[in-house]
């Protein structure tokens, strides 16, 4: 099999959901680095081509066009400028509000809502019944090939204008409040325990299951910043999901 044949076969397997960039094995997320390697080969093997559509001019590698869908796919893509790149999987009952973008290698499971101006970055893994609110972004992680992508587990609610980057894992049932930014260097303060959650040995921040995270700050501990009362941004876990929190999210789902 030639490199280009392997690439096209892998893209087809990604789009069908049979192959994933990352998957849960015995309760732990593992990256399939060979899939990333094949995806990256597509940029090397492809040739820049004219992909102009009507009055809109586009130019990209011919190996990585946008995906096309039919009604039989069961994916609701509302008109208005959304795009899904080749090699991305969208399960039946996924909803995309315009404009939104899902990049190569991403996996979006059933019942998930991708709201307007949202981004599902390259290789990001999104579980079932996730709500990705307007203008929120899940960062892409193609390199290094051994690094886990951003992972959002089942039943997570992500508020508007959030940014989840650098291989962050958000465990099931968590709620990320409006405007929260999380990356590998972000320490999260758990107000229920008084402890900070920092990146693990793999360089990843893991948001615990059911955590309700809001934007907050922490004081600079020393130097001129401390003298001036300067604070640094810090996400804060204010509580863990309860019936009241779940009730408000259920109402949001009903209003879709």
For every predicted segment, state its role.
Residues 71, 76-225, 237:
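Structural signal for interior beta-strand "rungs" in well-ordered beta-sheet cores
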Residues 1-75, 204-205, 209-211, 215-256:
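Terminal amphipathic alpha-helical/low-complexity segments used for targeting or macromolecular assembly
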